[in-house]
């Protein structure tokens, strides 16, 4: 019964995942198409400029080159948005994997506790073990349930009930995020952490870090124009 409730709970948690993934992949395809359209526009603008450059005035040349540069900037913006979206998608899937790992660990621990309790009762310690164990579990379940109700949104109610189900439902989302991450996952930013939330890329092509979390560089929205990370800005000042 506990296994069925555990499975139902996890399936509920990933119910919207396919739709979210489909949406993100669709957005990435749209960004790809926009980039291709803009590249085709750049080819046309470049061909026109080359064929007419001798007849253009200096101001007209600057104007045509500015259009080409703006188109390239737009291409880079689309590419940055696509990378950002890909990182968010990776984070979304990784969060569910880590949650599954956490739930499996708790499920195995619960089974182990029940098996140990059963062995103890069969060896003659039934009354003392059972009474003390139930008292401790009631206290633990009560605290867990209050934490869940106060700190997390209301979840769909499940039919039936068990100590294991109560334990799973009382797990705070932060417990999942605190699980160890994949050691092979790349790290970014000044904090040397994995990708999460909104991130921004440094426009210095030689930047050793490349990507930064908004909060770590005191950003709340994506700035207009080029952006350089604090480390690259400092290096640039030293060279002056």
From Swiss-Prot:
Source domain of life: Eukaryota
According to the UniProt entry, which residues carry Phosphoserine? 118
Subcellular locations according to the entry: Nucleus; Chromosome
Task: Please name the CDD domains in this protein's record.
Answer: ING_ING5 (cd16863), PHD_ING5 (cd15685)
Q: Which family does it belong to?
A: Belongs to the ING family.
Zinc finger (PHD-type) residue ranges?
186-235
Organism whose genome encodes this protein: Homo sapiens
Q: Which gene encodes it?
A: ING5
GO BP annotation list: apoptotic signaling pathway; DNA replication-dependent chromatin disassembly; fibroblast proliferation; negative regulation of cell population proliferation; negative regulation of fibroblast proliferation; negative regulation of growth; positive regulation of apoptotic process; positive regulation of apoptotic signaling pathway
Pfam families listed in its UniProt record: ING
Q: Where is this region: Disordered?
A: 116-165
Q: Which PANTHER family match?
A: INHIBITOR OF GROWTH PROTEIN, INHIBITOR OF GROWTH PROTEIN 5
Q: What is known of its domains?
A: The PHD-type zinc finger mediates the binding to H3K4me3.
Descriptive protein name: Inhibitor of growth protein 5
Q: What does the UniProt keyword field contain?
A: Acetylation, Activator, Chromatin regulator, Chromosome, Metal-binding, Methylation, Nucleus, Phosphoprotein, Transcription, Transcription regulation, Zinc, Zinc-finger
Query: InterPro entries annotated for this entry?
Result: ING_fam (IPR028651), ING_N_histone-binding (IPR024610), Zinc_finger_PHD-type_CS (IPR019786), Znf_FYVE_PHD (IPR011011), Znf_PHD (IPR001965), Znf_PHD-finger (IPR019787), Znf_RING/FYVE/PHD (IPR013083)
* Record-listed Zn(2+) 1 binding positions: 189, 191, 213, 216
Q: Does the keyword Metal-binding apply?
A: yes
* Gene3D superfamilies, A to Z: 6.10.140.1740, Zinc/RING finger domain, C3HC4 (zinc finger) (3.30.40.10)
Q: What does this protein do?
A: Component of the HBO1 complex, which specifically mediates acetylation of histone H3 at 'Lys-14' (H3K14ac) and, to a lower extent, acetylation of histone H4. Component of the MOZ/MORF complex which has a histone H3 acetyltransferase activity. Through chromatin acetylation it may regulate DNA replication and may function as a transcriptional coactivator. Inhibits cell growth, induces a delay in S-phase progression and enhances Fas-induced apoptosis in an INCA1-dependent manner.
Quaternary structure and interacting proteins, as annotated? Component of the HBO1 complex composed of KAT7/HBO1, MEAF6, ING5, and one scaffold subunit: complexes containing BRPF scaffold (BRPF1, BRD1/BRPF2 or BRPF3) direct KAT7/HBO1 specificity towards H3K14ac, while complexes containing JADE scaffold (JADE1, JADE2 and JADE3) mediate acetylation of histone H4. Component of the MOZ/MORF complex composed at least of ING5, KAT6A, KAT6B, MEAF6 and one of BRPF1, BRD1/BRPF2 and BRPF3. Interacts with H3K4me3 and to a lesser extent with H3K4me2. Interacts with EP300 and p53/TP53. Interacts with INCA1.
Describe tissue expression: Down-regulated in bone marrow cells in acute myeloid leukemia patients as compared with normal bone marrow cells.
Positions modified as N6-acetyllysine?
114
Which residues does the UniProt site feature Histone H3K4me3 binding point to? 188, 199, 203, 211
Where does this protein hold Zn(2+) 2?
Answer: 202, 207, 229, 232
């Amino acid at each position: 019964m506990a296994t069925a409730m555990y499975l139902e709970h996890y399936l509920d948690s990933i119910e919207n995942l396919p739709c979210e993934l489909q949406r993100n992949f669709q957005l990435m395809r749209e960004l790809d198409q926009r980039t291709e359209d803009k590249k085709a526009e750049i080819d046309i603008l470049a061909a026109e400029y080359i064929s007419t450059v001798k007849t253009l005035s200096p101001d007209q040349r600057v104007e045509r080159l500015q259009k080409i540069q703006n188109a390239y900037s737009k291409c880079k913006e689309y590419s940055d948005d696509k990378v950002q979206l890909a990182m968010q998608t990776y984070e979304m899937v990784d969060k569910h994997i880590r949650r599954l790992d956490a739930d499996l660990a708790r499920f195995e621990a619960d089974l182990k506790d029940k098996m140990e309790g059963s062995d103890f009762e069969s060896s003659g310690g039934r009354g003392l073990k059972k009474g003390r164990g139930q008292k401790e579990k009631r206290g633990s379940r009560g605290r867990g349930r209050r934490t869940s109700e106060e700190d997390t949104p209301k979840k769909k109610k499940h039919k039936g009930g068990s100590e294991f189900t109560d334990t799973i439902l009382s797990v705070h989302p932060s417990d999942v995020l605190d699980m160890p991450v994949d050691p092979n996952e790349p790290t970014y930013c000044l904090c040397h952490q994995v990708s999460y939330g909104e991130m921004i890329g440094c426009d210095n092509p030689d930047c050793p870090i490349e990507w930064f979390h908004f909060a770590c560089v005191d950003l709340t929205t994506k700035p207009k124009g080029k952006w350089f990370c604090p480390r690259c800005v400092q290096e640039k000042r030293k060279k002056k």
